Amino acid sequence: MPPKKADGVKKARAPAKRKLAEEFPSGEVLTDNAKKKWKLGSAVGQGGFGLLYLANEDSSGPVTADAPYVIKVEPSDNGPLFSELKFYMRAAKPDLIGAWMKSKKMEYLGVPKYWGSGFHEKNGKRYRFMVMDRFGTDLQKLFEGNGKKFSRKLVLQLGLRLLDILEYIHDHEYVHADIKASNLLLSYTNPNQVFLVDYGLAYRYAPEGVPKEYKEDPKRCHDGTIEFTSIDAHKGVSPSRRADLEIMGYCMIQWLCSRLPWEDKLQDPLYVRDSKLRCRDNIDEFLKSCFASGNIPAEMGKFMQEVKVLGYTDRPDYDKLRGILQQGLKSIGSTDDKKLDFGVATNSTSLPSVKTPKRKKAEEKGQSADETDSTPAKKRRAPQKKEVNGAKKTASPAKRPVKKETQASSEPAVKKSRGRPKKNS
């Protein structure tokens, strides 16, 4: 599976087997499968191999700059949007999300709502489209703009929001598999609400409520974004609930300390995998390496320990995990006041900053991951500009083959690190 290139590439370029969507003029009207009409505004970004447009319900007037929706359009024979649609249609309909929120007495849930989809013919070509909520900026921009550090209170609050999101999608048979700051977007109208987007790698881990069994596939090693992806993914195992929580843990630790210990060798996925294996086996040493000052947030160790003991098919105790993060807030004399403060962080000194090497992303094929019993299809994104709804994905060259490890149970044995970076794997 090809790695993912670093951000900042300005010119879009797709692999030969993928087609880029042509740009539609403002005012183009699309009709979804429910016969509802939507009017396109200007193109405001590119996501994967599709274009993003401002949009509104069809009316006599133009689509203005404050339009509440965006529409993603891709050539119909491309795979990424097809796979996202499978998740949205099964798990993100507004009434489904609304019923969950009511049952949990929640003010909001950070899962984007599905508003419609369909096909559109233009110049003899057929396109697939999906209507989504419009969002604001992504957390990666805020993280970098804040010196690559968030306050402890903010990180714990984001963790609580993520647990709400993950419990919902997990209980609706899916896992996300690519949690990271660039996939977390603020609401367009409420800066205290954050949403998890980009379900191109979302995997239906439990069709009809039955979790799939642990199985390694050497051809699918290192799926996801390499610095955050789970140990299971490094070993070619299909995404799971415990994997989502492991990824979430790496994200929270990075937000607190600026970078993870393996971030200077992202070009060597085996080194990254083996580093994570060692860190899982000695969580205390892992956290010491992240927080050089010794001011280690105790809740991070407890959180990672809970994730460590989860079996591949286990249902996480979301309430227990929430309790760990809430106790962390209490230890700093704070509570979850539902207000997200992205101001200057006050965490103690941690690891020195380094330049982040190229990242890696899976290529998603035309078949949806939830349509097969095999490991989820990989995806590759084309480089693009990022404008709206965090629409920025990139492609990378091929990786070297990975040596398969022996698997006796759902908890793989630790292998020694190769310790040597290798170019662009």
UniProtKB/Swiss-Prot annotation:
EC class of the enzyme, as a word: transferase
Tree of life domain: Eukaryota
Keyword Cytoplasm: yes
GO terms under biological process: cell division; DNA damage response; Golgi disassembly; neural precursor cell proliferation; positive regulation of protein localization to chromatin; signal transduction; spermatogenesis
Enzyme Commission number(s) from the entry: 2.7.11.1
Gene Ontology cellular component list: Cajal body; cytoplasm; Golgi stack; nucleus
Residue numbers binding ATP: V44, G45, Q46, G47, G48, F49, G50, L51, L52, K72
SUPFAM superfamilies linked: Protein kinase-like (PK-like)
Residue span, Protein kinase domain: 38-329
Family indicated by similarity: Belongs to the protein kinase superfamily. CK1 Ser/Thr protein kinase family. VRK subfamily.
Name the record gives this protein: Serine/threonine-protein kinase VRK1
Naturally occurring in which organism (per UniProt): Danio rerio
